[in-house]
Amino acid sequence: MPRTKRVYSGKTITGVLYPVAICMLFVAINVKLSQPEQQEQSKVVYGLFHSYDTADSGTITLYLIGFLILTTSLGVFCYQMKFYKAIKVYVLANSIGILLVYSVFHFQRIAEAQSIPVSVPTFFFLILQFGGLGITCLHWKSHRRLHQFYLIMLAGLTAIFILNILPDWTVWMALTAISFWDIVAVLTPCGPLKMLVETANRRGDDKFPAILYNSSSYVNEVDSPDTTRSNSTPLTEFNNSSSSRLLESDSLLRPPVIPRQIREVREVEGTIRLGMGDFVFYSLMLGNTVQTCPLPTVVACFVSNLVGLTITLPIVTLSQTALPALPFPLAIAAIFYFSSHIALTPFTDLCTSQLILI
């Protein structure tokens, strides 16, 4: 029985890098448009905290991690018990809340910040068209490109929503804690995400396209056995009867040769599925960098996220198993962020003040 090995081409890898880059750029542009420098708006952590002391950052992070662990565990439990309708209702409610409700406040803030004159009926008509089409594309049949576009919009708006309600340093603490939780949830034997992947592979179903970004919606066909030559097939056939008798006589003198089992490995083009949470946290980190740092640091974090994701994908090819997509990109982005914030930004400021052109 040939063993199947999934390989990932450059086209498949870029099929994931492009949407991640688009999502991060969408968040960065929207953060700049909604919060111009001359109008800095205060953030409010709804229902939890009303001050931004450093001591509160750890408490907020614990609340977020607890909520994430609870929702992930409940989602995996519902999936294993086949409570598909409950999961679909939860995902549908989140999509409506982000694409229809929150988008009203977000785009209203952009219109006010940029002094864009829009009438109320026109504004609500555009939001209804945007959100209604998005919900239809995410939860029912639609064109593949349109479905992928609204997955990116959903992740980007979710990242902006989280960014607007969290203090700056709390974002970094939350991202660090979420990265460790991602490792535990995916790699440990009792991790909920590992159990989810194993259950989905065992059932062979993909019932929730609204929470997974698929690099391709097409299934590549495996080559038929006729096109693959087995190594045990003889290259020469003897038709001469004397040769046949000679072989038969020799076989009486020699012990029978036990054929060695040769295991064929068939390479199949695989598709990469990235959770929408990964899109959200990549964009959350970049959006926080846009708020607090100059352009060189933003560019460094943007590139480092893509580099970290590019490092993760070959490891997936070698291990042939699901891996957490957050630790490598966020670790490299954190290194670039702090090194750029400590060394590069003061250096460029000094060169600018001294009129030194490099």
From Swiss-Prot:
Supply one GO CC term from the record: endoplasmic reticulum membrane
| Protein name per UniProt | Presenilin hop-1
Q: Which residues lie on this side of the membrane: Lumenal?
A: 34-57, 108-115, 170, 295-297
* Domain notes from UniProt: The PAL motif is required for normal active site conformation.
What superkingdom heads the lineage?
Eukaryota
Organism whose genome encodes this protein:
Caenorhabditis elegans
In the induction comment, the record states: Down-regulated by spr-1, spr-3, spr-4 and spr-5.
Tell me the intramembrane segments: 322-342
Q: Which UniProt keywords apply?
A: Endoplasmic reticulum, Golgi apparatus, Membrane, Notch signaling pathway, Transmembrane, Transmembrane helix
State where composition is biased (Polar residues).
221-240
